[in-house]
Amino acid sequence: NRKPAYGVAYTKAGYERVIRDLEKLGGTFSEEKLLASIKVYNRHNAAMRKVDEVLAKHPEITAAQRSDIFKSSFFMTKEEHTELVEALIEKLEAQTPAAEKLPIVISGILTDAPALNAILDEMGLHIVADDVAAQSRQYRTDAPERDDALNALAEKFANMDNCSVLYNQDKPRVKW
């Protein structure tokens, strides 16, 4: 189990082993760079949580567009994606939402299925929330910002919940 102190220590030890293996290939690990990266990723997480909230209020954003907003984060730096998402949030918050559609919540691992998104859009459905690993679920938990970056990452992993691929003996459910 990843949550108790021994689970956090085990996760950190795994990270340290990967670092040693990578350093054998060349380069060196930098605590300072990892700490800076945690700040970048936490800011990106916050922007993605905010855009998720804003998209719930804007039925004019199609399922396909929503999917693209989340998917695009895999293809650019987090800094660049954060800036684009923050600009989108600003524009959406400044405009009046379109007429309501039938709200739905989606769940799963992946929903980047153009045919499924087309059906959702054709049926006039509006995704108001998701529990999708490739969408908002990955942004729920930030790494603590402090001096020990590897412990922060291990604690982030320990604090992640409500994901079918992460063991949790209590099996909690998402609270809407």
Where are these regions (language model features)?
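Short, charged, low-complexity loops and linkers
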Residues: N1-R2, S30
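A short, charged helix-loop
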Residues: R2-Y6, R17-R20
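Hydrophobic structural segments
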Residues: Y6-V8, M160
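Short, amphipathic alpha-helical "lid/cap" segments that border enzyme active or binding sites
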Residues: V8, K12-Y15, V174
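A charged, amphipathic alpha-helical module
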Residues: K12, E16-E145
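Alpha-helix capping/termination and helix-coil
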Residues: G124-I127, F157-V165
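Acidic, Ser/Thr-rich peripheral helices and adjacent loops at domain boundaries
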Residues: E145-N159
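A short, acidic, amphipathic alpha-helical segment used as a generic capping/interface helix at domain edges
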Residues: V165-W176
